Amino acid sequence: MGTAMSESPAHDTRHHSYSPGLEGVIAGESALCLVDEGEAGLLYRGYGIADLADHSTFEEVAYLLLFGHLPTPQEMKAFAVQMTEQSLLPRPVEAFLDVVPKGSHPMDVLRTGMSILGMTDPEAGDNSAEAKVRKSVRLLAQIPLFISAADRFDRGAPLLPRHSDLSFAENLLYLLTGQKGDDRAKAMARVLDVSLILYAEHEFNASTFSARVTASTMTDLHSAITSAIGTLKGPLHGGANEAVAQMFLEIGSPAKAERWVRESLASKRRIM
């Protein structure tokens, strides 16, 4: 007891560095996507985003990201059949939507719905790489149905059936709005298709990072995606889109845009 206790830190930090927000830290690598600040821009598995947006569909891009190559016509046909066969919402999911409080935030509904889809997945106990690919295809088929069902339940509108002869974007537009077939619907579906392609992969953004952290614990696919949805909801991530949409509604028309921006700058208001 007579020996003096030395005062020293509990851990030796001489070989460690602190990086707020992980700035400058390489947390991992991705073979799926590259966000290049130079001329290359955004690349999915080596393909430039402009080429994919101009010449591919969202389904083809999803196949590319899942399997590593663009599909042949035969592979694309089989992929479409798979998604059609998986286009069903389990009864517990529909029961959940029936009791969701009116006016709930769509991201809250999607986050909770993803958990229920995980519990009801026919391969819930299988976390093999092969099963995760099948679950991913299943979710590609289920999520448009879920999003449209959540919206229509909230509005008290009847649910609409998926059409196997429509593309992914055409189906999503139809399920949400009931519009299909005419020139206006086709133009809207094309815009939606390009938007889906542009949002499909962004390398190591916040929601991808949170999903990878969750997945690194060897948990299931749905849990990792649930983490990503919770992260995406934040106003500094995907929630910024919601703020922009609200801004457009507030401005009202192009003629009012300049005045709105000037007044916002004068009041030091954040412009999204």
Predicted regions and their residues:
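Hydrophobic alpha-helical bundle cores within soluble ligand-binding/oligomerization subdomains
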Residues: G2-M272
